[in-house]
Amino acid sequence: MTQPSLNSLYSDHLRTLTARADEALQRGGFAHLVVPSGNTHYQLFDDRDYPYAVNPQFKAWLPLTRVPHSWLVYTPGKRPIVIFYQPFDYWHVVPDAPSGWWVEHCDIHIIRRPDEALALLPKQAERCAILGEAQSTLGAYVPNNPQPVLDYLEYQRAFKTAYELALLRIAQQLAVRGHRAAEAAFRAGQSEFGIHMAYCAAVGQDANELPYGNIIALNEHGAVLHYTELGQQPPQPLRSFLIDAGASAYGYASDITRTYAADPGSDFQALINAVDAAQLRMGQNVRAGVDYKQLHIDAHLALMGILKEFGVLTVSPEAALATGISAAFFPHGLGHLIGLQVHDVAGFAASDRGGRIQRPEGHPYLRLTRVLEPGMVVTIEPGVYFIDMLLDEVKKNGHAASVNWQRVEAFKPYGGIRIEDEVVCTDGNAENLTRPVFAAA
């Protein structure tokens, strides 16, 4: 996307953010919104910094992710002020001077020391809603994170602007580039570590830049939902590959999962194909007015139907759901909101004034319980796994006869399957952000 088009989209995005901030400040009774970018700080008993992570509330306003000790100040009716920390430092690379599509929309002040920000922040700290972590405290400017302000801003973050959708699309393109390289490395017999390195090289991002730790799981490791160990030697024989990996674009995240079989003629490949087709249908059901909780329950029924067809279950999908057996094979939620954060905020919010929509009973890991509305971007990530500790619970709970254990043993060496796309809820049909990028890659 060209800079002029991002310039126009950013201008509209900024109008949306200022309108939201106006309302949030009014609800909280504050005169100014003050957002620190966050600071670097040392690891315990060491002189090395933890990897820096920018405050999500800061990067909502600015496409800046590597500017610690900086600040965003917004006062209703005025242009946003950016206090940009650019130190004199010959030990490290300092941030480049502000440039890009956003600079003409803000008043920018360069500081060389963190405490120089004090002269540029609003005079009365008590009139400021300061959104940040405790380490960002500067003099009297202590992050207070007022709940009415956070409730409103975080609830509204579910509704993506056109600018945000553009950056999410860029993040998709970067991640798919990595996924294609990772699949090629798998087909070439690389180790998990080698596949991970191929992914990072293709995306052009290291572990600190990626939005989350890559899940690169070969064979049985696919049964560990968040497997991040990265084995140095490829297993023999090589059976399967599950990759859950994303990319970052100006502070916005992608989150994509694919599963591959080494043998395209195997039963496991057929099971992948069935889950993939079901996942595509689930994504098409992302529509305004649909309760995401129901999509999650429907996903359980669809996946258990597949396991019944493949001879893994001996009972109906409905019986598997009612008895909790389905949770042994599909133990996580269908998905979550995504945007500035991989698991974006306010997935349980009852309204922009707070409150919580509870998860369905028996589904403790679902991360989104809201009714879908236009502008929301969600992940759709059904999975089927063969996890010993969960399957043991099925036996302990007296449901051993509901499972064909011979079929389970046949699939266990492959670990599991997960397919994940990002989908936009619109006024009409769902827009899958992920599939077209794979098709074009």
UniProtKB/Swiss-Prot annotation:
Cofactor, how bound (note): Binds 2 manganese ions per subunit.
Q: Which co-factors does it depend on?
A: Mn(2+)
Gene3D superfamilies, sorted: Creatinase/methionine aminopeptidase superfamily, Creatinase/prolidase N-terminal domain
Q: Kindly list the biological process annotations in GO that this record carries.
A: proteolysis
Instruction: List positions binding Mn(2+) 2.
Output: 244, 255, 420
Query: Record keywords: Protease included?
Result: yes
Pfam families per the UniProt record, alphabetical = PepQ_N, Peptidase_M24
The positions annotated for binding Mn(2+) 1 are 255, 336, 381, 420
Q: Which reaction does it catalyse?
A: Xaa-L-Pro dipeptide + H2O = an L-alpha-amino acid + L-proline
What Gene Ontology molecular-function terms does this entry list? aminopeptidase activity; metal ion binding; metalloexopeptidase activity; phosphoric triester hydrolase activity; proline dipeptidase activity
Describe the function of this protein. Answer: Splits dipeptides with a prolyl residue in the C-terminal position.
Alphabetical list of PANTHER family matching this protein: XAA-PRO AMINOPEPTIDASE 3, XAA-PRO DIPEPTIDASE
Tell me the protein's name.
Xaa-Pro dipeptidase
Native species = Xanthomonas oryzae pv. oryzae (strain KACC10331 / KXO85)
What gene, per UniProt, encodes this protein?
A: pepQ
